[in-house]
Amino acid sequence: MATILAVDDSASMRQMVAFTLKGAGYNVVEAVDGLDALTKAKSQSFDCVVTDVNMPNKDGIELIRDLRALPNYKFTPMLMLTTEAGADKKQQGKDAGATGWIVKPFNPDQLLKTIKKVMG
């Protein structure tokens, strides 16, 4: 089964994402912020990345930009999971290489449906 990197500085949100994904059979690795995620992504390969936008140390947009620069992550689906619903943040995410966008609070079925869609 696919392995997904879940990135959020909120422990409760990470746990909710991980619980939803594990319940659907995915393997999940959690990261507390963009720096933690980048370190994990350099040492392990992930099939999909789900990241918050607003985080300390390295935000989700910077994380996606940095991951896209790595050869292993040029085509990896990357979803932004955030309270930010504004058009300019969405555009920044797209420009950085985000595959999709889910607004918090999210519906677990919506998260799974979106993951399945972007992972083909």
For each predicted feature, which ranges?
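Charged docking surfaces used in two-component/phosphorelay signaling
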Residues: Q15-G23
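Receiver (REC) domain active-site loop signature in two-component systems and cognate sites
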Residues: M55
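Active-site beta3 strand of CheY-like receiver
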Residues: S45-V50
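Active-site residues of response regulator receiver
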Residues: D52, T82
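C-terminal output helix
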Residues: F106-I115
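Short hydrophobic/Thr-rich beta-strand motif most characteristic of the beta2 strand and flanking loop
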Residues: G25-V32, K40
